[in-house]
Amino acid sequence: MLSIERLGVGRGGQMVASGIDLCIEAGWALQIHGANGSGKTTLLRVLAGLMPPAGGQVSWYGANVRAHPEKFRRDLAFVGHANGVNDDLTVLENLRFATLLGAGSGAPDGTSSVPASGRSGVAAPPSRRDMLARAGMLPLQHTRAGCLSQGQRRRVALARLMLDRKPLWLLDEPGDALDDSASGWLHECLALHMQDGGIVVATTHRSLQTPAARTRHLHLERSGAWLD
């Protein structure tokens, strides 16, 4: 469970959002909406523990993410605008590297903050080859990532998410640069992750197709932040 308590978010010395209170349970999604410059990416970075909040706190299963960063990061997968893909590695090597880093949920002892009841285990771990096929990247598996288009790099970054299987996904505009086919695959990945008890928090200019009954929407506007 990701808990946000009286959270304030600032940028450039100015408050862009304040007083945000909500809890995101296992199997749920939060979509963050707002115009350019509204603070969506800043808020996501605060939730990831990459920036300090201007007020309040963020907790992961009861532990403050700033006070216990190692405990939090073992369960966190963050994909920003830069994708985090290594240009010097091939597509397949990027996935192999991600699998090695994600072994045991990133924890030396294989532990996680998520209780067993929080993950259903419905989705079986896909193979790298299967994931590349689903992403439409199998013909390019031996191509260096630096030679890929932005949309193809985005597919590689999203494929790593499914292989890594971290319980919390923080995604900055995950649908950017994706064509209709890749967008459909993205929405399938999000639904499978939630079905398996994972949490999705994503900024987006347009609504993502996550299960409506388990999705909340946070809107950032000049007048303040509001939930529906």
Curated annotation (Swiss-Prot):
Residues 2-227 form the ABC transporter domain. ATP binds at residues 34-41. Residues 106-126 are annotated as: Disordered. Its EC number is 7.6.2.5. Signal peptide: none annotated. It is found in: Cell inner membrane. It is an enzyme of class 7 (translocase). Keywords: ATP-binding, Cell inner membrane, Cell membrane, Cytochrome c-type biogenesis, Membrane, Nucleotide-binding, Translocase, Transport. The keyword NAD does not apply. One of its GO terms (molecular function) is ABC-type heme transporter activity. It is a peripheral membrane protein. PROSITE patterns: ABC_TRANSPORTER_1, ABC_TRANSPORTER_2, CCMA. It catalyses: heme b(in) + ATP + H2O = heme b(out) + ADP + phosphate + H(+). GO terms for cellular component: plasma membrane. GO terms for biological process: cytochrome complex assembly. Gene3D superfamilies: P-loop containing nucleotide triphosphate hydrolases. Part of the ABC transporter complex CcmAB involved in the biogenesis of c-type cytochromes; once thought to export heme, this seems not to be the case, but its exact role is uncertain. Responsible for energy coupling to the transport system. Belongs to the ABC transporter superfamily. CcmA exporter (TC 3.A.1.107) family. The complex is composed of two ATP-binding proteins (CcmA) and two transmembrane proteins (CcmB). This is Cytochrome c biogenesis ATP-binding export protein CcmA. It comes from Paraburkholderia xenovorans (strain LB400). The gene is ccmA.
